[in-house]
Amino acid sequence: MQGLVLQLTRAGFLMLLWVFIWSVLRILKTDIYAPTGAVMMRRGLALRGTLLGARQRRHAARYLVVTEGALTGARITLSEQPVLIGRADDSTLVLTDDYASTRHARLSMRGSEWYVEDLGSTNGTYLDRAKVTTAVRVPIGTPVRIGKTAIELRP
């Protein structure tokens, strides 16, 4: 009888250990691959309608600057038209990056804010080390990484 209790205790402890490991891995996975769009959108909504609105318009992004990669130093003057980024010849910003897809990402203006969205690329688009899964607001000076290329919005 004591042998049976000991075996059941061991099996129960082993099962609890595996449940703990599984929960830790699940939490790590959600932290690493969590979409950041909701948090960024909430921050944008909280600032709308305050005194920062006028300040943001004054310091609105006017340029898209390549800060890392083969095109470092390249600058695009922004208009209200979306900016297509990728290796395709008809992209606004044509990348020679092996890790960029043909149609990799799109920067588009919504109101007075710029948003980046991944267009189903293979290697993903990152906003300040967070993977972009939905359209996410891009603050001025925050790097957007596409492969080995990093771009920023500048006033």
UniProtKB/Swiss-Prot annotation:
Major localization class: membrane
Domain of life of the source: Bacteria
InterPro entries: Cell_Proc_Reg/RNA_Proc (IPR050923), FHA_dom (IPR000253), SMAD_FHA_dom_sf (IPR008984)
Membrane-spanning intervals of the chain: 6-28
UniProt keyword annotations, A-Z: Cell membrane, Membrane, Phosphoprotein, Transmembrane, Transmembrane helix
Matches recorded under SMART domains: FHA (SM00240)
Protein name per the record: FHA domain-containing protein FhaB
Lineage: Bacteria, Bacillati, Actinomycetota, Actinomycetes, Mycobacteriales
Gene: fhaB
